[in-house]
From Swiss-Prot:
Superkingdom in the source lineage: Bacteria
Descriptive protein name: Chaperone protein DnaJ
Known role: Participates actively in the response to hyperosmotic and heat shock by preventing the aggregation of stress-denatured proteins and by disaggregating proteins, also in an autonomous, DnaK-independent fashion. Unfolded proteins bind initially to DnaJ; upon interaction with the DnaJ-bound protein, DnaK hydrolyzes its bound ATP, resulting in the formation of a stable complex. GrpE releases ADP from DnaK; ATP binding to DnaK triggers the release of the substrate protein, thus completing the reaction cycle.
Gene: dnaJ
UniProt organism field: Shewanella sp. (strain ANA-3)
Keyword hit for Hydrolase: no
Domains (record comment): The J domain is necessary and sufficient to stimulate DnaK ATPase activity. Zinc center 1 plays an important role in the autonomous, DnaK-independent chaperone activity of DnaJ. Zinc center 2 is essential for interaction with DnaK and for DnaJ activity.
Length: 377
């Protein structure tokens, strides 16, 4: 079956602790265990999937490789001629979680060739790239169908035969004390088939390691957390089974000027004391260049101005966000004597008129005065 994202399988976030991962694993393994769901193939498949996700995410090295490269980073078949492994083995679940609560049971039916694993590629973009869209060339390490044997794993003119040990199931029963568990077949290594004359290139695996280059169109407006699915661009399936998909996971880097919130952009623009008091026009940066913004007289620091349509075009609709500019008044520095003198003269003109010129300051000091009066009464 298709390999889903391991974090999604366990229902945990990417920042989940090992304890949270183990807790989720126990709950799901108990829910899907084959002995609780006899004859339920879907539950058995889910059980195997949960176990595989747990094994990867609780191994520090495997988890790091998976976080970077997705399933390609932890595929046990990447060594060349290796056998089937991973999710198909659930015999050792007893020691991990349930002790000797459950017993095993033989499941009928021949093992089907597995669909190729899905791959994930972590793509980091600048804000400009994410907003405008672009085409990216991606180099993807993957498993491709062997071009010598056409994915069969067998030498030209020969073919695979059903394993006589497991009769095509890929697993055998093992008696351990009072319990019976299943393990990968030691003869066919869990494949269910025997290749007597393996292909010289893929050594019987049917797939070979390959790094392919894809040209991927990134739509305008993508944001961190968005995922682009490329159907059929994952790993090749086993022995001619369908390939998996490739998921491009988008992360947008922080910007030096703008902060993005959905389709809106935010920025802070410094203005001088005189410009805030007297009003005028200032230049404001946008992703398309500078625009002029009219500042009314007596503008207070922290006031927000909205420039409609200067934000981000939605990737899912025709809506366009806004640019919100917060003006921040700068206190002048490195003043010469003449400038200081002018400010002193200006300050002197405000004496006795604070309510008129600084209503917020006057209200604040009135509040402080009342606070201490109440405190001492």
């Amino acid at each position: 079956m298709s390999k889903r994202d391991y974090y999604e399988v366990l229902g945990v976030g990417r920042d989940a602790s090992e304890r949270e991962i183990k807790k989720a694993y126990k709950r799901l393994a108990m829910k899907f265990h084959p002995d609780r769901n006899p004859g339920d193939k879907a539950a058995e498949a889910s059980f195997k999937e949960v176990k595989e996700a747990y094994e990867i995410l609780t191994d520090a090295n495997k988890k790091a490789a998976y976080d970077q490269f997705g399933h390609a980073g932890v595929d046990p078949n990447r060594g060349g001629g290796g056998g089937y492994g991973g999710a198909g083995d659930f015999g050792d679940i007893f020691g991990d979680v349930f002790g000797d609560i459950f017993g095993g049971g033989r499941r009928g039916g021949q093992r089907q060739a597995a669909r190729g694993s899905d791959l994930r590629y972590n793509l980091e973009l600048s804000l400009e790239e994410a907003v405008k869209g672009l085409t990216k060339e991606l180099r993807i390490p993957t498993l491709a169908s062997c071009d010598v044997c056409d994915g069969s794993g067998a030498k030209k003119g020969s073919s695979a035969t059903t394993c006589g040990t497991c009769h095509g199931q890929g697993q055998v029963q093992m008696r351990q004390g009072f319990f019976t568990v299943q393990q990968p077949c030691p003869t066919c290594h869990g494949r269910g088939k025997i290749i007597k004359d393996p292909c010289s290139k893929c050594h019987g695996d049917g797939r070979v390691e390959k790094t392919k280059t894809l040209s991927v169109k990134i739509p305008a407006g993508v944001d961190t957390g968005d995922r682009i699915r490329l159907a059929g661009e994952g790993e090749a399936g086993e022995f001619g089974a369908p390939p998996g998909d490739l998921y491009v996971q988008v992360t947008v880097r922080e910007h030096a000027i703008f902060v993005r919130d959905g389709n809106n952009l935010y920025c802070e623009v410094p203005i001088s004391f005189s410009k805030a008091a007297l009003g005028g026009e200032i230049e404001v940066p946008t992703l398309d260049g500078k625009v002029s913004l009219k500042i009314p007289a007596e503008t207070q620091t922290g006031r927000m101005f909205r420039l409609r349509g200067k934000g981000v075009k939605s990737v899912r609709s025709h809506a366009v966000g806004d640019l919100l500019c917060k003006v921040v008044m700068e206190t002048p520095v490195n003043l010469n004597e003449r400038q200081k003198e002018l400010l002193r003269e200006f300050e002197a003109t405000l004496t006795g008129e604070s309510k008129k010129h600084s209503p917020k300051a006057e209200g604040f000091f009135d509040g402080v005065k009342k606070f201490f009066q109440d405190l001492n009464s």
